[in-house]
Each structure stands twice: as C-alpha cells, then as structure tokens.
C-alpha cells in the first residue's frame, strides 16, 4: 500500500517552508553538472549569478574547502573526473548550505581519487559541521564517514540504524547488509 509520508526539514513542513529551505541544501549528482569547457571559477560564477550569491566571497571560500584553489589556475577547462567531482561539491557548498545530498559521490573515480573524495566528505562533516545524506553502494567507504545508515530495498525502507549498533552486530557494514538482506529474503 502506498504511503505518501511526510517531510520535515529544518523545522519546516509546508510546501512554502520547504521551498525556502532549498537554499540550505546542496546536491552532488552522480555525474557532473559542470560545463566542461569552462574553468572551475567560471562554472562557479555562473551558479553564483543564477542564485544571487556574492561570487567574490563564495568562490574562494568553496574552492578552498574542496582543495581546488590551486587546481583552478592550472587549466581553463575541466578534464579530470576527480576535479569535476570536487567542483560539484564546491557548487553544492555555495551559499554555505547546511545539508549536502550525495548520489554515489565516488562514482567512476580511480582508487586514489575515491579515497580523496571520501576523506573530503568526512572533513566537511567534522570541520564544517555539514550534515550529509549519501546514497552509495560503496559500503566500506560509507562506513568510514557514516554515523547512521538507512537501508532501502526496492523502494521500501528496511531499517535505520546507528553505526555504533551496526558495529556491535557485525564486523563490517557490508556484512550487516548481507545479514539484513538474508533476513528480508526469508
């Protein structure tokens, strides 16, 4: 049976309140939304202009947060997928958002870039106080930054659990997931 459910974000429940809250939420898609022919700065200038943000203040701040302040001077266009991913995260941070939503943040990256992106996500949480909602199939990396997990299968919420409980019940997040899926299929 369908259940439309409800959403509450930063204390807001109505459509109007939720619409106003969108400025506090940044989204990082699984494939880059950056204009490949433009530099990181040019991409961010476009977003600042669209969203009415002070580019002179925001761009240096977000580039520094994601470690692109040096990289952006190297090229007039964005070629490397790791740089695109950092730029996508910088874009999501524009306006000093409180909640970041990631869809497969390390999708398509090589092992070193994967490690780097997950380290960045953890640092943004610890040092900047950003709340993260992360959709990922990379359970080992996810376990390194998560404080709690929500398990969804075929559109159905299976379980929500803290990482402390998960660590008490299984040697790894992957093993916890295996056990959960085995129980569901019975």
Residue ranges and their predicted role:
Residues 89:
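Hydrophobic anchor residue at the start of the ABC signature
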Residues 115-127:
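Helical segment within the ABC ATPase nucleotide-binding domain
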